[in-house]
């Protein structure tokens, strides 16, 4: 109604974060600081390689892929998206954006479409179930090592049209639900 939009991404980092709850709060503590690199050039638990800029300290950045995204057209929101999923977040968000804006898919189809992921190291292209055999064969012929994987992201999204606001819950998350206005 007012043209406002928010995209939010949160994390515990590892499953159950640090593995303890702050006394008297019920809040499970995360371990997002693990995303700083302990040693430049060495891979972290997720296979991401950090450098000097990712060492802990003032004005340094952790190796985080959080990408809460609001896409604007003429200064107005047309798509709000984001996802959990560690290093797979950026490719998941990009694929939803490309599906909606370039392929003109309805937001629910864009969110539900199978996804692939490549993150520099390892040299695998991780593919979710649902890609047709021709696509996978074409990737293989181009030299890509195809590695089947289970879904690892959940890109809940909102499309804003001239007439409506349309929510799309990603079925990769059990119990996901989108409610329109």
Enumerate the predicted regions with their spans.
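Proteins synthesized as precursors that undergo proteolytic processing into mature forms
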Residues: 1-150
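Cofactor-centric catalytic regions
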Residues: 130-181
